Design a protein with these regions (language model features):
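Nucleotidyltransferase catalytic core that binds NTPs
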Residues: 2-170
């Protein structure tokens, strides 16, 4: 039997996940232990520029990384996060926090989301070993031939290698 928080059944975990990494997976696993239904939503955000991975690749990587969790669903969206939260009937939006600067930006967004929709954001802190991991940094390290295999699932490491070449160990 899964321990749940109150009677909450559905949470939304939105992000670009370009690429998904071990910090994201940790947040998904914690949410999956706390809630009955976790919706991981990959955003299509043209304002962020062209992602490294296509939407389909990102969703496939998320599916592979969360295959061991039976209460995780994957979707995508290009609307406001709160609109998707309403659509999937999410009780909360879940966001991971690595460092204090994450809290500053995420709190502002959480307050705005609550103001326009009433949806509350729940923050889950990352484990210390994941606090330094960021998708942007993973892409940069991989682009210059660095090894990111300790920060991402093996499928992500393989796809990064196919895009940038094998790690040089530097």
């Amino acid at each position: 039997m899964r321990a749940t928080l109150c009677d909450v059944t559905t949470v939304l975990y939105p992000g670009s996940f370009d690429p998904i990494h071990n910090g994201h997976i940790e947040i998904i696993e914690v949410a999956a232990r706390l809630f009955d239904d976790v919706v991981v939503a990959t955003v299509r955000n043209p304002q962020k520029g062209e992602p490294l991975f296509t939407l389909e690749e990102r969703q496939d990587l998320i599916a592979d990384a969360t295959a061991h969790l039976d209460n995780v669903r994957i979707t995508s969206f290009s609307s406001l996060t709160v609109d998707l939260a309403r659509e999937v009937e999410a009780d909360f939006i879940v966001k991971g926090l690595r460092v204090v600067t994450d809290f500053d930006s995420e709190l502002m967004m959480a307050q705005m989301n609550r103001e326009v929709s009433g949806v509350v954001t729940m923050f889950l802190p990352s484990a210390p070993e994941h606090c330094f991991i960021a998708s942007r940094l993973i892409r940069e390290i991989a682009r210059f031939g660095g090894d990111v295999s300790s920060m991402v699932p093996s499928g992500v490491a393989k796809l990064l290698a196919s895009k940038y070449g094998e790690p040089t160990g530097g």
